[in-house]
Amino acid sequence: MQEVLNDLFDYSNLKIFQYVEGFKFSLDSILLAEYVKISSKTKNILDLCSGNAAVPLIISTKTKAKIDSFEIQEDIYKLAKKSIVYNKLEHQITVYNADIKDIDNYKKGVKYDIITCNPPYFKVEDSVHINDNEILAIARHELKITLDDIFFAATNHLDDKGEFYLVHRVSRLDEIIITANKFNLNVKNIELIKTKENGKPYLVLVRCIKNSKFGIKINNEKNIGNLKTYKNLFKEDS
């Protein structure tokens, strides 16, 4: 498959390797990376379902914290690795070609302050058509992991009161909240994203805290349809 080196949207000096045809990073990854709240106390971050490392690369512009990332598909992992090396971020970002169910084989006992995830959105049983391209199929459909797998990995590898950030489809928000509660990752904040002023939200960003009290804050819907940058989009939200 032919590769291309692109600008990582408007993040100056960041480049990312992608395939000319097929897998590319999405706006969802940018929104997730921007949504993450990082403090001076943040020591380490884990990114699940990392793709070609768009989320870790963007997060690296906001912190010096160490970032580990896991990507199950070898071809996509290689793109992520090349992007990290090209941007000279090997000292900060480490990517593993592994299933998130096997994190303990690589980082046994390590607990993270923050975990992020831009997962496959679609259940296999609900899908009328699954892409013939295996890479795209695995990236978009729950062929290798489920929501339970994701929340299990997050709760197992988060420090107490650590934060988990997830981007997903609005249509699965009820399932997300139920699953989060099951794994003691109570949802604290919800952001709803739409692309038209009078349109319905299609994306949801959630922030969970491990072993926290119940109570959810839902911020005003954000229309991103005409935005030229997504930097500081969530700056006023808490």
Model segments located where?
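N-terminal auxiliary segments of SAM/dcSAM-dependent transferases
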Residues: 1-4
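SAM-dependent Rossmann-like transferase core, predominantly class I methyltransferases
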Residues: 7-44, 50-62, 204-207, 221
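Short, structurally constrained coil/turn elements
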Residues: 10, 89, 181-184
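A structural micro-motif
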Residues: 14, 43, 65, 91-93, ...
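Conserved Class I SAM-dependent methyltransferase catalytic core
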Residues: 15, 21, 144-201
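Conserved SAM/SAH cofactor-binding pocket of Class I
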Residues: 34-108, 114-128, 152
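Mobile active-site "lid"/loop adjacent to the S-adenosyl-L-methionine
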Residues: 121-149
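SAM/dcSAM-binding transferase cores
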Residues: 197-238
